[in-house]
Curated annotation (Swiss-Prot):
GO cellular component entries: membrane
InterPro entries: Prd_NiFe_hyd_3_EhaE (IPR011317)
The entry's keywords: Membrane, Transmembrane, Transmembrane helix
Protein's name in the database: Uncharacterized protein MJ0525
Amino acid sequence: MLNVEVPTIGVSLIFLAYDEALALMTFIAVNAVLSLILIRAVILDAEYKENNQ
């Protein structure tokens, strides 16, 4: 999970220099997208392992 959080925090810190609301929205959006990608990767990995047994 740490590998997902580091880019999210970095992006939100960049936008924090411009606007706090923009930084918060960016943090939430990037976190949601990366969570979906991570969940999908775990599901595909489980399916791959199931099919190759």
